């Protein structure tokens, strides 16, 4: 079973002297693969050491941006939706844990 990888990974594999086997996903498969990738990157963030957390969080952000673009949202539109939700329901700054 394969997984979605960053755009330059096939070239990096080729540069190491190996031949990558890959395909370009159809639109629906791409959306599903992005969702799977988001869960993968979130798990990696959770499991990362303190030193690796920034890099893993950047990976999560990259997948979120790709998902937004896939849904037709640019960063500005996504920020607007997030701001609207924050104004209606708040953020997470107060660290409230509901029992």
Briefly describe each language-model feature range.
Residues 1-99:
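Flexible "arm" and connector segments at domain edges
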């Amino acid at each position: 079973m394969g997984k979605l990888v960053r755009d330059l990974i096939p070239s990096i594999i080729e540069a190491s002297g190996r031949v990558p086997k890959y395909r370009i996903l159809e639109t629906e498969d791409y959306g599903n693969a992005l969702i799977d990738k988001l869960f993968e990157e979130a798990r990696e963030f959770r499991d990362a050491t303190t030193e690796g957390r920034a890099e893993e969080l950047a990976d999560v952000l990259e997948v979120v941006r790709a998902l937004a673009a896939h849904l037709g949202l640019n960063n500005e539109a996504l920020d607007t939706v997030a701001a609207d939700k924050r104004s209606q329901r708040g953020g997470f700054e107060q660290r409230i844990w509901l029992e």
